[in-house]
Amino acid sequence: MNFFSKLFNLKQNNHNRDTNSDCNNFYLNELECGLTPGQLILIDWTQKTGRNYNFPRYFKYSLQIDPESTHNQLYKLGYFTKNKTLSYLTVVELKTILSKHNLATSGKKAELITRIINNVNIDNLDIPFEFKLTKEAQNLIIEHSDYIKAYYDKDITMEDYCKEKNNISFKATFGDIKWSLLNKQAHRNTVSGDFGCLSNTRKAQGRHLEQEGNIKHALTQIIHTSLN
């Protein structure tokens, strides 16, 4: 943990708040990309994992989707391609396949996989699928990466980010919109006299400045927070 992280005492990500299952219309409505927040995050998650199983709980409790059925819907809509893969299997499982086909079972995992590919028709094997994003899905993730950043951000919510983005008349960056949100939050904390929350907001501003590479102002924020 670096110097700034220790001083700012980082908190858990927003997406880990999966205990509140109250209905939130924001997560049920489509974003400008034509997908719900849950669908967009699920596409990003699939890009990172390649899986269609072992979904995190936040898909159901925070994003309010059934990840398994939603994943299947997105596949049918052409956001994913799928191919059988040996990479998810354990060494023991790979050796079992080799043994059944009377092939040598010695070697490291990469060697075992290569041996199977060279000697066995993997289409006939009962093995997992690996999902990859189509070009359309890749472009979608790139174009709307700011929403994904907002969902995983430690200091703002995706919902607040979306509202603030829609309220800004010019084309703002993710950093601009987040800074605007934090400034408004600091103002509300000051007006209400909630200086405990204000201190936390100032720390969030410092983290943001550090992430933006603005070290000078980040240090100023640290000093300002420490003196209050």
Regions found by a protein language model. Give the residues of each.
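An N-terminally focused, membrane-permeabilizing/fusogenic/translocator signature enriched
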Residues: N16-N20
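Basic helix-extension-helix modules of the SAP/HeH family
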Residues: L10, D22-I168
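Charge-rich, solvent-exposed alpha-helical interaction surfaces
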Residues: F3-K6, I97, R115, L140, ...
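Short acidic, low-complexity intrinsically disordered linear motifs used
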Residues: M1-N13, T105
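Intrinsically disordered, low-complexity, charge-dense segments enriched in Lys/Arg
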Residues: G175-D176
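Amphipathic alpha-helical repeat scaffolds of TPR domains
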Residues: T157-F170, S180-K184, F195-Q211, L219-H224, ...
